[in-house]
Structures are given as C-alpha cells and as structure tokens.
C-alpha cells in the first residue's frame, strides 16, 4: 500500500473519530380526535402540531399523526401501531379522557412514555403503577373543580346541580365537584348524565330545573357541552351556569351562541393572555404560541386544546436533549431516559408552570387557572 493511500485512510479514520454522532430520527407518535364528537378539541391540536419544529436539540423529529375519530378502540389501535410498526419513542395523545385511559396499559407494557392531552387526574394517578410512563398537560379536574367551587361560594351559591357526560370525563367531574362543593360548604342537590352525541337532554334538564339549584355545572367538553346549556336557557333557568375548561374553543361559542352569554368557567390563562398582568409567568410563552397560531389559522382561532398540544412539545423540547445524552433514539434506553427527563421537567408552558415529580405527572398548580366569563361571544376574565 502506498504512503499516499495509507495517509488518506488515516485521515479518514481520524475525521470519523471526531465527527458528530449521527442519531436516528426521533419518532413522536400522535393519536388525536380530529373527527367525531371531540373534533372541536382535536382539530386545533392537529393544527398546532403542523406548526411545530421538525428538530429538537439539533436532531430530526419524525411526527406521525393519526386520527382516532374520538373512538376509544381506534385510539388503542393507533397506539399499538405507533409503538409496534413505527417504533415511536414517545406517544402524544389522546384528546379525550376515555381514549387516554385506554392507552395507559399499552404504553406501560411497552415502556414507551406518553404525554396525554386529556384532563382527568386518573390518567396520571400515582396509585396506578402503570402511570409511571404517563404524563399529561391539561389541568387536573380537581384543580378546576376547586376554582369553580370557590367562585360559587364567593358569589353566594349555596346549592348546585350537575349534568355531565356519561363517560369517564363526566364521572370524574361529578366526583370532583362533589368533593370541592363539600369543602366549600355547598350542596349538590341533583345530578344527571347524557351521552356526547345526544341531540336532546330535555328530561334531564327538567329534573335539574325542578330541583331549583342556585347554579348548575355542565361537565362536558367541545360542542356537545352546548346541548344542556341551550336547553337550560329554553327552560328559563335563572341561576348561574358553569362549564368546564373542556368547552373553551370557538366552535363551542359558535354552536351555543347568545345562550352562553354570562357562562362561567375555569381555564388556562393562555386563552386570555392579553388580559393578564406582565408578571404572569405564562404570558410570554402564550403570546408566542397564539401569535404564530392565529397568523396561520385566523384571528381568535386560539383554543386551550391547541395550547395542550404546544405544551406537549414544550415538555419534549426540554426532555429530549437530556435523553440524548444517555442513549440513541429508537432504543428502549432512550425511551427510559426520556421518561426520566419528563419526570424532572420544570418548564413554563402556555397553560402554566410544569413542575413534574415522581408523584405528580401533571405538575400544574393554581397559576394554571383563571376564571373567565363569556361576554357577547368573547372570553373575558371574570370578577
């Protein structure tokens, strides 16, 4: 071998030794509800993901987004596919509580971290060992229920009625509002259920109105939350009407119309970031996200649900560079390192400050809640 060839080989080997390590793509698998009853929640999530970067920490991100049609079975099928066929390093989703709860066992058994965009605290219940692999970005129902009950008490409410979805979301909210009501000296005098796709709730509303509570809470999400609201107005109910943070999107305002004026609900502060003081920690992050979102999708197109998708990215943007120091994407070691990094996250999102711990895989506190009212079709901070 000639000296020139040996020199070339040596130079190549030396260059390779000091070249940056090339990792495989980081695969983020997403299942969300872009169609079906929860579409008004899932569409802004999907829209937000389309705005997100395709690199984190200098490494390429491969986004795979699937629609579960608001169906639990499809959410499970999507999750299995993303893990077994696409080798996802992390799962984001789903949009609603029943779907997310059904996904917990799958990701835990596969040891793939998951960031849910649904609300129920059951999704990250530390008493369930499977939730070691699960995190979520929306505020816990308990945090929001406390805000509602405190607002009711401060405004003279003594008795309340409840109507909510006949599923895990509605059941969770009924349990939480009963707990929060008792803690604030309020009495729940009636509770009713309905299905997300019901077109009439006349029977349930008549029972609620007959109980004559000072206020009624509707435990629903998306446009189906308008069904009992419109019926209550039609039946001339004169008390205060509260909704959950699950209805905070333009489609709900459009469907509910004037019947929702005066409605009260707890919400992440991002929705009304312009009305927040400069000292609020989320204002800067929320402004950046909403400015970008509305530049593409139109003025006042913001929703809290899009914010949940963005906050999922905020968490991953923090955790992925940490995990990359421990292992390469596409490996079980990387997924474990990513889970560990998520559990130590301390970051500011659009909804609040996420301070994760082994016992708290949501990490939000009272800074993630403001009470708002609907005033002539606009979201306004409540007094």
Model-assigned labels for residue ranges:
Residues 2-8, 12-14, 24-383:
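Extracytosolic ligand-binding ectodomains
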Residues 17-19:
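N-terminal signal peptide c-region/cleavage motif recognized by signal peptidases
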């Amino acid at each position: 071998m000639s000296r020139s060839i040996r020199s070339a080989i040596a130079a190549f080997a030396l260059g390779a030794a000091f070249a940056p390590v090339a990792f495989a793509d980081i695969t983020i698998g997403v299942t969300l509800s872009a169609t079906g009853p929860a579409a008004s929640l899932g569409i802004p999530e999907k829209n937000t993901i389309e705005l997100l970067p395709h690199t984190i920490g200098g490494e390429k991100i491969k986004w795979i987004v699937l629609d579960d049609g608001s169906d639990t079975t499809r959410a499970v099928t999507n999750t299995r596919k993303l893990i077994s066929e696409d080798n996802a390093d992390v799962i984001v989703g789903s949009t609603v509580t029943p779907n997310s709860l059904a996904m917990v066992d799958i990701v835990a058994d596969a040891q793939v971290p998951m960031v849910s965009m649904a609300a129920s605290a059951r999704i990250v219940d530390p008493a369930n060992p499977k939730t070691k692999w699960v995190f979520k970005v929306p505020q816990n129902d308990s945090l929001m229920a406390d805000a509602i009950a405190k607002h009711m008490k401060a405004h003279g409410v003594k008795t309340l009625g409840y109507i909510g979805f006949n599923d895990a979301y509605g059941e969770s909210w009924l349990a939480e509002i009963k707990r929060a009501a008792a803690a604030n000296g309020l009495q729940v005098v009636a509770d009713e259920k309905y299905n997300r796709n019901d077109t009439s709730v006349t029977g349930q509303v008549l029972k609620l109105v007959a109980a004559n509570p000072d206020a009624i809470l509707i435990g629903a999400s998306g446009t189906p939350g308008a069904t009992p609201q419109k019926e209550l107005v039609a039946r001339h109910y004169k008390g205060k009407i509260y909704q959950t943070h699950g209805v905070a999107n333009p489609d709900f305002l459009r469907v509910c119309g004037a019947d929702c004026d005066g409605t009260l609900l707890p919400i992440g502060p991002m929705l009304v970031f312009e009305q927040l003081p400069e000292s609020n920690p989320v204002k800067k992050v929320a402004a950046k996200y909403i400015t970008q979102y509305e530049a593409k999708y139109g003025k006042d197109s913001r929703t809290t649900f899009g914010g949940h998708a963005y906050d999922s990215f905020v968490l991953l943007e923090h955790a992925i560079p940490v995990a990359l120091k421990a292992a390469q994407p596409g490996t079980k070691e990387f997924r474990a390192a990513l889970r560990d990094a998520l559990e130590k996250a301390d970051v500011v999102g659009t909804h609040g400050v996420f301070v994760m711990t082994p016992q708290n895989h949501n990490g939000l506190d009272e800074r993630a809640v403001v009470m708002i009212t609907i005033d002539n079709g606009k979201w306004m901070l409540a007094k």
